[in-house]
């Protein structure tokens, strides 16, 4: 049975929640400021995926998201450690786990930025030397950069999946 009321009412939702059953580490924070509840989605994200804040409403001791056409409830498990929203399941995590996920995702973004810069640099170097993009020389040069970073991503992802990893199109499949 899912319940949202009981001790603390809507305050039971406050904390960090990691989405389950997906191939990324999405962490949402539910917080209360000046009597209002907010959901800050994807606190480890950046760019278009950066944290987005949504106002939540309290209704009968549970939090709901107003969609403009109705309210969608956030449901809590009896123990308060699992939250359900639409088809998603979220597990409560502590601040240390959230910090670890955020730090890991920052490392992933940093590695991706380095890859993009080196990849673009190699491309420019080769095209400035008039190496055609359809030649084996070009493909091998680009694959060399991809191999270097594919290995680094593989090592980094031993500690957790990166939310975004570049597609390595020149590596042998």
Which residues does each PLM region occupy?
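C-terminal motif of bacterial Sec signal peptides marking the signal peptidase cleavage site
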Residues: 2-4
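Bacterial signal peptide processing site
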Residues: 6-8
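Tryptophan-anchored aromatic micro-motifs
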Residues: 11-26
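N-terminal glycine/threonine-rich, aromatic-flanked beta-hairpin/loop signature
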Residues: 22-69, 148-151, 158-160, 166-170
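Short, exposed beta-strand-loop hairpins at the edges of beta-sheets
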Residues: 75-87
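Edge beta-strand at a domain terminus
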Residues: 84-121, 147-171
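Charged, low-complexity interaction regions
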Residues: 119-137, 162
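Intrinsically disordered, low-complexity charged/polar segments
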Residues: 136-148
